[in-house]
């Protein structure tokens, strides 16, 4: 089933952009390879289960697949990161209202519409997360889907 899922997702067009995932444990300080399909959301509030996750990771993806239109819950704005995707740790950004800094991860490569440098990435992430913090709570349809429980490994460790 897993190989069929990956094969099917691989056929979808890549959707470059910034996507988010709740994060458990310390911020990564090196590269990591995604070990399984990693669900993320274009909405930081969804990805962090209303900012209850230990941390939030912002991922600059070149190859992520937008699966929201195919999802049972399209309002989650899900973007799948495929297995074997290499994510580089490119820093953190402090956001007022969050206990821990947002972890910044990025695929190698470029695509139109992505931040041109780390300063622009920090600015865009700060704006998106600040806007999400101001929104009302989002109904969590699938607890743990976008944010592993505290102490549970992330998709690449």
Pin down the residues of each PLM region.
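Mono-ADP-ribosyltransferase
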Residues: 1-157
């Amino acid at each position: 089933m897993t190989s069929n899922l990956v094969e099917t997702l691989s056929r979808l067009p890549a959707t470059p952009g910034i996507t988010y995932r709740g994060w458990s444990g310390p911020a990564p300080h090196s590269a990591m390879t995604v070990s399984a399909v990693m669900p993320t959301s274009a909405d930081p509030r969804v990805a962090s289960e209303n900012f209850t996750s230990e941390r939030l990771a912002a991922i600059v993806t070149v190859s992520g697949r937008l699966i929201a239109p195919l999802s049972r819950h399209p309002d989650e704005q899900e973007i799948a990161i495929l297995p074997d995707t290499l994510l580089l740790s490119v820093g953190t950004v402090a956001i007022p209202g969050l206990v821990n800094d947002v972890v910044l991860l990025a695929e190698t490569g470029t695509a139109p519409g992505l931040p041109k440098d780390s300063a622009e990435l920090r600015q865009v992430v700060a704006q998106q997360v600040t806007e999400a913090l101001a929104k009302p709570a989002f109904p969590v349809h699938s607890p743990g889907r976008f944010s592993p429980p505290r102490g549970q490994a992330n998709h690449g460790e």
